Every structure is written in structure tokens, then in C-alpha cells.
Amino acid sequence: MLIFEKSRKNRRTLAHAIADKMDANDIPANLLRHDAPRLPELSELEVVRHFTRLSRQNFSIDTHFYPLGSCTMKYNPRAANRLASLPGYLKRHPLSPAPQSQAFLQCLYELQTMLTEITGMEKISLTSMAGAQGEFAGVAMIKAYHESRGDYDRTEMIVPDAAHGTNPASAAMCGFTVKEISTTKDGDIDLEKLRQMAGAKTAGIMLTNPSTLGVFERQISEVAKIIHNAGGLLYYDGANLNAILGKYRPGDMGFDVMHLNLHKTFATPHGGGGPGAGPVAAGPRLSKFLPVPMVGKNKEGYDWLTEKECPKSIGRLSAFMGNSGVLLRAYIYLRLLGKEGLSRVAEFSTLNANYLMKRLEQLGFTLAFPNRRASHEFIITLKPLTRAYGVTALDIAKRLLDYGFHAPTIYFPLLVPECLLIEPTETESKQTLDHFIEAMEKILTEIKTTPDLLRNAPHQQLINRLDEVKAARELDLRWYPIAKETEIFIQ
């Protein structure tokens, strides 16, 4: 039930009582409303109960196993939230002078240092407000590099068929023509086709390694050689960095620029469209093009580096200096784990993924790449079950909700039919994984005996299935309802 449907005329809260005591004569006439605002009228208790009830309907990392592939839904340590909320950080104004912000700047400077070491890059900018914005910045840096050399004919960006959708979008936004490169049946880039594609028009290639197929690109050194010999650059999408922390570094693989997703790899909160952070790191070729501001260190302490100190920078991406609360949480996470802890993140994320993959294979599910070891996530294809029983990946995803699990990513990557992309992350226990396996075993039995149970799932949620096509095509979003029967409170 909507909160508007609970509204009753003249029902008040303490806030209403306070507002009633205000003298409208103290407010200029041109600022006064002529009509009552379209706000629901409820008691404070009713409001509290309404939103508490809604909160109990949420799936979150704090309440459920969340194996959403390519999203790294790991636990966000509460210590990071607590320390990042200390008054000295919360009360600091974004435009506070550097001499009054030395502790804050020191944290950001040390975060820059740690992230450059983790990635094998030369320099990093923390200012990007999200992974997608960081990705756009990295591609813009590639464009700036070629243009600074007078190489305006490099208009093509190579993107694998298994890439995240943001990759071709970022390339197109920067004015590049996207050239899709295919993947082999074992999940690697097709080198022969890459050799044919790379040439004088190639600006670069955008890769995730491990890829969204859940396997490591084994020929990355040869890929880097082909692109660099053609005069192009390598962009690293940091979406799957969690799998290689402390083991492999993108800079050592030959990548020239990359972005990091702090909400994935470094345990800052997901959700709601922000706030986020997507730092951009670059090697020697591109570091001078990094967006500003960055934090520098001199004999007086720490200070902001702006366009004055970085004249080749692509400029600013946002107001102020990035989302400081998110950056502080990532800094605290890194300090809590240290080098050894980060290596264990990679080890346990890979261990959990491979354990889950093998157990599901033993149950009878079909792996998309049965001859490959999973990196941190893996894909099962339900095509044989769809063909035999008419049950789809969507049906299984909906049925998992009844068993208390968030569904994995479905139908992505697009080149694997009827797929589930499953990523357990390093923070889940073997017991949790075993419970998920038990649920998948029961679902497999249901597919073979009572497939209609899945076709009509979920059965234990307040909402069954939405018309997703209609919802996408006929957008009707507003903060208040338009039905007359729900507008009684404003009459």
C-alpha cells in the first residue's frame, strides 16, 4: 500500500503542530503557497510503521546472500562506516583551505599511493564520481593522447563481445567508432581477428580481465603487443579486479589506463545511484592527462593539484573533489586488510566461485566454459533445461527469491544463451554456499517434475511478476499518485 493511500485529512504529526504555530505574516507574500502541498497526512507512528514495513521487504547484503555476477556484492565492514563518519571528516567543508584539511588530504594521498601500487600504474585521480564516469574519463584520456600527437585518424575503439555495456557507450560518447571483437569458445579474445582488426585507425581496446565470462584472458600479453604495435592503447575496466588483488596488476599486463570500482573491489556501499567513486589510474603514456584535482605532497604538507600544476589534464569531472565519504571508506578498508589481506580477498573469492561452480556442475547444471577455472564468478547456461522443460533463466531467478536468495545476474553476457552469472565473493561462508547449492538442487528437481512452479514464481513475495516490457516502454514515474481516490487529502 502506498503511503498516500493511508492518508487521512487533518491527521497530524508533531511537525505539523510546529508548522501551525508559524506566522505566515513573517514570510513574503510572493513566497507563500496558494494550494496545499500534495503530501500525505499521517501520524508519526503510521509513518514509522510504513517505512519499517518497506525496509523488511528489501533484499540487501546485510540480510541475504547476493550472488549478483559482475557486481561483487561483498560485505561492507561497519568499521569503515564508523571511522569515515568521525566529526572531523563529516564537518569539513569541501572548499576548506588545504592547511585546514591536512588529515583529510593525507588520507587521500595515501589512498592514491596504495591504489597505484595495487594497479601497477604511475598516477591516479580519485575525483570520478562513479565507475562509469571513471571509464568515460579513461577513454577521454586516450582521445586526448592521440590528439596531442596530431593522430586524429585513430577513430576506432575495439570492444569484446562479452564487454560491459558501458564500454561501447563510453567509447561512443568520446566520439569513437566501436569495433566488436569476438571471443573464442574457451573465453579468450580471438587473436587472429584482433590482428586483422588492429591498424592505423585503432585508438585502443577496452578489456576486463578476468572477463565478464568469469575466466582470465590467458593471452593478454599478446593482446597488448598487437595493440601497442598498431599504435593503440589498452583500457582496463576494473569491474573484476577483486579476483586478482595482490596477484596480478593491470599495469604489468600492459594496460595504459583503467578505472576502479570502489563499490565492488574495496567494499564501499552499492546502491541508489550513488554516491560512488571510480578512480582513474594511468601509466606513463597517459598520466599527464588525468582529471583534476589530485592530491600532491610538498615540504609544507599536502595540497590540491589543479589545472595549473597539470596543464595537460582533461579537466574536472565534477564539482569539488570527488565523493570524500566513499573514498575514506575505501581507504579504511585497505588499511584494515593490508597487503596480505588483499591477497586473501583474491584467493577466497576465487575459491568460493570454483567450489560453487563444481558443486552445481555435479548437480547437473551446464557450465558455459567447462574446461576453464573460474576466476571470481562463473556462468551456467540453462539452454538444455529450456529445451527439455521450457523453463528459462528468468524462471530460476524468480524461484530463488522464494528460497531467500537474491537472483544472480541473468542474460548477461549476451553471447551465452539462458545464462546465470554467479559471483559469491570472498565474504560468504561455506555454509551459506551450501545452502544456495541445496536451493539450486531443489529447483532442479522442480524443473523436472513441476516446471509450472517455476514459471509462476515467485510465490512468497508481495509482488509476483511485473510486465517488464511495459514498464520499460511506458514510463510513468511520479512522486504522488494521480488517481482521484488517493488525492482526498489535498481537497
From Swiss-Prot:
Reactions catalysed according to its record: N(6)-[(R)-lipoyl]-L-lysyl-[glycine-cleavage complex H protein] + glycine + H(+) = N(6)-[(R)-S(8)-aminomethyldihydrolipoyl]-L-lysyl-[glycine-cleavage complex H protein] + CO2
CC per GO annotation: cytosol; glycine cleavage complex
Family matches, as InterPro entries: GcvPB (IPR023012), GDC-P_C (IPR049316), GDC-P_N (IPR049315), GDC_P (IPR020581), PyrdxlP-dep_Trfase (IPR015424), PyrdxlP-dep_Trfase_major (IPR015421), PyrdxlP-dep_Trfase_small (IPR015422)
Top enzyme category: oxidoreductase
BP terms from Gene Ontology: glycine decarboxylation via glycine cleavage system
Molecular function terms, GO-annotated: glycine binding; glycine dehydrogenase (decarboxylating) activity; pyridoxal phosphate binding
Cofactor(s) named in the record: pyridoxal 5'-phosphate
Enzyme Commission code(s) on record: 1.4.4.2
Gene3D superfamilies: 6.20.440.10, Aspartate Aminotransferase, domain 1 (3.90.1150.10), Type I PLP-dependent aspartate aminotransferase-like (Major domain) (3.40.640.10)
Keywords: Oxidoreductase, Pyridoxal phosphate
One Pfam family it belongs to: GDC-P
Sites of N6-(pyridoxal phosphate)lysine modification: 264
HAMAP family assigned: GcvPB (MF_00713)
PANTHER family (alphabetical): GLYCINE DEHYDROGENASE (DECARBOXYLATING), MITOCHONDRIAL, GLYCINE DEHYDROGENASE, DECARBOXYLATING
Protein family per UniProt: Belongs to the GcvP family. C-terminal subunit subfamily.
Subunit structure comment from the entry: The glycine cleavage system is composed of four proteins: P, T, L and H. In this organism, the P 'protein' is a heterodimer of two subunits.
Job of this protein: The glycine cleavage system catalyzes the degradation of glycine. The P protein binds the alpha-amino group of glycine through its pyridoxal phosphate cofactor; CO(2) is released and the remaining methylamine moiety is then transferred to the lipoamide cofactor of the H protein.
Protein name (record): Probable glycine dehydrogenase (decarboxylating) subunit 2
